[in-house]
């Protein structure tokens, strides 16, 4: 009974994770167990913390872009000099930071990721036949990792149906001469409740290198801001998870309900000796766009002001980078729209002031952001559960091409441009989500972007509901095709027909292209 009274007293004294003082004296803590069997080991040297990672090992790297990456442990891998690594990561960072460091030192044989972003080195190595690259939709990657950590060998998802992910044939490896050597394999397809799904297999790794905010001395871990991202599911899906943190605190500092990763998933912990916490895209609202920039282009502004009319009060929406994000600037202050970011935020606010910039709070475009009161953070697997589950009412994104029947292509130009699909395939996979495409009507070479059939690899099949360009607005019927419903006053019907690569119907009640009022 005395022991029970002691424990009850300890729990009554617990505090929030944001208050670092201990809640129980050390001489009392020693009288009951605070760690599991197979005690978590603590390190001071990052190189020793990655002991056991050998040539050819599979390694998960937590983070999203440069946010929440285990930068000290990545540096230790470079120092250690292990080669032929298979890296599983959401993104590949930039050329000279994060995963880019290991690519530059030629230590990586294969990368499994969803998005290359601005890492030109990774793209060059891939196209030159010096790197294997397995592109996976971001939500599918998160779920494959989550499944690996929970003992589920495989699962079905609607993401990627009708694309090369399903059909196979996505280049994984080129020869130095540019010939295809390895291609992705087709997926098994089954139909559930009238919708096609792909079979995806779970993924595990030998090691996971994780970045947390704080750990207690029994190995429990908490994260800060949007740095939770892929760190949480990855920590659970490896034989050995190594967590670097900014601070190690006493047992009892965290209230049990505040712990994000229980110590059962953690094998090693190290307090990082230094953190650069580099920001990939510093964006603030007190830095106006330069004269002549894309943000002041009248064509883009026209699309933005029309796109803003798609927001409804109380809506949950996900916005792609560029025009969709800029459309959120026109949301009326009388309206509440909950903006979702696939890296783990619900309730995005405006870009920060310079003094408010926080490297642990970024959006899916790697831009610094703020979060509105009532907003929240979560891990990437939870984020894509919201997306695939149809809890997001609107997704707005750009496109390279859209077909007459709503097929979307926006992630790859074979042999030339390789960015990756990111979360786009997941975002367009739910039948409950309205998909709006915002884009310029033609390419820079004046070629139509609205076509009878897409010629580039698809992001989604029959998934687009509305197309907004600087010339017109089209509704998409996925069996009957396009209907022109709005026309910009400076454009003519003949001009739109001449610059559109497919036939379309004209609404009998054709309207001038609508624009939100700036003071709405």
From Swiss-Prot:
Cystine pairs: none
GO biological-process terms attached to the record: ketone body catabolic process; ketone body metabolic process
Transcription regulation found in the keyword field: no
Active site: residue positions: 342 (5-glutamyl coenzyme a thioester intermediate)
Keywords per UniProt: Mitochondrion, Transferase, Transit peptide
Organism: Rattus norvegicus
Transit peptide keyword on record: yes
Pathway terms, separated by semicolons: Ketone metabolism; succinyl-CoA degradation; acetoacetyl-CoA from succinyl-CoA: step 1/1
Localization per Swiss-Prot or TrEMBL: Mitochondrion
Name by which UniProt lists this protein: Succinyl-CoA:3-ketoacid coenzyme A transferase 2A, mitochondrial
Transit peptide residue numbers: 1-39
One Gene Ontology molecular-function label: succinyl-CoA:3-oxo-acid CoA-transferase activity
Lineage: Eukaryota, Metazoa, Chordata, Craniata, Vertebrata
